[in-house]
């Protein structure tokens, strides 16, 4: 399947399911089952309920999608600084 045949839509994660799967409500109100892309799993990008995401849907099956981007929350404060390992 070529990349040109995929639909890119925005949505909000409603529920986190086992095995890195999610239930996402799209902007048009449709609910789809989605999974995290390999690149997101590789870089350990955490997706939580309430996150805005961008997903790709196949034109052949509009009930399943692949999450390929998690939008950063502008109003979230920067995280607590972690203790870095200091070489002595």
From Swiss-Prot:
Coiled coil: none annotated. SUPFAM superfamilies: Nucleic acid-binding proteins (SSF50249). Residues 1-72 form the S1-like domain. GO terms for molecular function: ribosome binding; rRNA binding; translation initiation factor activity. The keyword Nuclease does not apply. It comes from the Bacteria. Its main location: cytoplasm. Keywords: Cytoplasm, Initiation factor, Protein biosynthesis, RNA-binding, rRNA-binding. Pfam families: eIF-1a. GO terms for cellular component: cytosol. HAMAP family: IF_1. This is Translation initiation factor IF-1 3. The gene is infA3.
């Amino acid at each position: 399947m070529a990349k040109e045949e995929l639909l890119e839509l925005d949505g909000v994660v409603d529920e986190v399911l086992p095995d890195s799967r999610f239930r996402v409500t799209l902007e048009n109100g449709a609910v789809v089952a989605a999974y995290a892309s390999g690149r997101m799993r590789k870089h350990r990008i955490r997706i939580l309920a309430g996150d805005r995401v961008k997903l790709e849907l196949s034109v052949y099956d509009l009930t399943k999608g692949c999450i390929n981007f998690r939008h950063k929350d502008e109003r979230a404060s920067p995280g607590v600084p972690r203790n870095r390992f200091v070489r002595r």
